[in-house]
Design a protein with these regions (language model features):
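Short, conserved sequence motifs used for protein processing/export or organelle targeting and
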Residues: 55, 62-271
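Intrinsically disordered, low-complexity Pro/Gly/Ser/Thr-rich segments with frequent PxxP/GP/PP motifs
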Residues: 313-341
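Asparagine-centered strand-capping/turn motif at beta-strand->loop junctions
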Residues: 155-157, 292-297
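Local sequence-structure signature of Cys/Sec-based thiol-disulfide redox active-site neighborhoods
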Residues: 24-65, 69
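Terminal connector regions
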Residues: 240-254, 339-370
Length: 405
């Protein structure tokens, strides 16, 4: 982590144009809420906690920020392959006595609370004045996977503590994985949101040594995002940043959050196929392939010509239209295509020319279905008028191969 820190104390009567704040308000504001929820993939009541937290955030847009900390026994991945734990979770839980799940804190101003208390505690905090305002923005270089986080803070009143700490949390959304759920049934397709993956400023944050009214904090961090955390892949398009100040290691007067922007694309217009949905073994019937495309360009993607064929046979074309922002993806079901079946079959998909054609193609293999020969015994149970019953057995071409009656 690299950082650049600038602190400027301003006289109360100084013109606002003298200092360089750009993303933080200098007017007194009420507290923003940071809800840190302690959770786990085998915690059956945790989905209810997630829903409660999401409702609080949705009811207070721009004023409530969620951090889901996977920690404790319920976060043990077992054989699932989804280890959402971090090096920071145990210490965060220990300082607030989070030994039941789900539990959480509102601005770290109490011991861990049960989910039934979160809404009331959040409303109380939102009604209190804050002595500091926080603003944050972030950008990710898509070539290097480096995130740059810019945080500003402005003290509108003296902090009760001579030293404060600035914290920057990196979160990941939309991670599909397992979750025990007592209300809706266990699933392997749960959408995990606001998942803490890293604390860019370390366990307890960076020290702020001047905390009097008029103090302006301007800090920039850079952090190289890895390909995965504990084997769980990182998707940079799903990342989120929450910045907050604590008076010690507890008691947050305020915080803020943002979704990163993205820069340094290799091309302005670049669509690429990222995956083809697995195709089950086939008997030679027409298939309807599903392909996922991603906008890996700087400009919005609104149209793509898709050409596809199987086993080198006749190609078909399909034109997709829509709207994808940079790094967004969409799965497209292509119209059915016929082919000459082989033992191993290959579908090839190519996107239309754009600014970078090096990533415009993808292929996927699928097998012929196994054939078996065996004896089939058919028992036909009739009523008292059995002579009126007839039967037919037909093949895949709707031809009658056996009949009776």
């Amino acid at each position: 982590m690299k950082k650049k820190l600038f602190i400027l104390t301003i006289l109360v009567l100084t013109s606002l144009g003298i200092h360089s704040q750009t993303i933080v308000s200098t007017s007194p504001e009420n507290k923003k809420v940071v809800l840190e929820e302690f959770t786990g993939i085998t915690c059956g009541y945790c989905p209810d906690g997630h829903a409660i937290a999401n409702n609080i955030a949705n009811n207070n847009p721009g004023n409530v920020f969620l951090i889901n900390i996977h920690q404790g026994g319920y976060a043990n991945p077992g054989n699932s392959g989804f280890d959402f734990r971090t090096p920071f979770g145990n210490a965060l839980a220990a300082q607030v006595g989070a030994n039941f799940y789900p539990s959480g804190t509102i601005n770290r101003n109490s011991n861990a609370l049960g989910r039934g208390s979160w809404n009331g505690a959040a409303n109380t905090a939102l009604g209190q004045s804050s002595d500091v305002n926080v603003g944050v923005e972030a950008d990710i270089d898509v070539q290097t996977n480096t995130i740059t986080v810019h945080v500003e803070a402005f003290y509108t009143a003296d902090s009760p503590e001579s030293n404060n700490k600035l914290n920057v949390a990196l979160l990941q959304n939309n991670t599909i994985g397992p979750q025990t759920d007592y209300a809706n049934g266990n699933t392997t397709e749960y959408n995990h949101m606001h998942r803490l993956v890293w604390l860019i400023t370390g366990q307890w944050g960076e020290i702020i040594t001047t905390t009097t009214a008029g103090t302006f904090i301007d800090e920039t961090y850079t952090y190289d995002i890895p390909n995965d955390y504990n084997g769980v892949p990182v998707k940079i398009q799903d990342l989120e940043v929450v910045a907050f100040i604590t008076e010690t290691q507890l008691d947050m007067p305020s915080g803020s959050g943002t979704f990163p922007t993205y820069s340094n694309f290799s091309a302005e217009n670049n669509a690429r196929p990222t995956s083809v949905e697995a195709i089950l073994p086939q008997c030679g019937f027409d298939i309807t392939p599903n392909v996922t495309i991603q906008n890996f360009g700087e400009n919005d993607l609104t149209e793509v010509e898709i050409t596809y064929s199987v086993n080198g046979g006749a190609s078909q074309n399909y034109t997709w239209t829509g709207s994808l922002l940079s790094l967004q993806s969409e799965t497209i079901q292509l119209p059915a295509i016929s082919y000459e079946v082989e033992d191993v079959n290959t579908i090839e998909i190519t996107l239309s020319d754009d600014d970078d054609n090096s990533d415009n193609q993808i292929s996927e293999n699928f097998n012929i279905a196994n054939e078996h020969t065996t004896t089939v015994n058919m028992i036909l149970n009739t009523d008292n008028a059995g002579s009126q019953c007839t039967w037919d057995i037909m093949n895949s071409n709707d031809e009658i191969i056996y009949s009776g009656g």
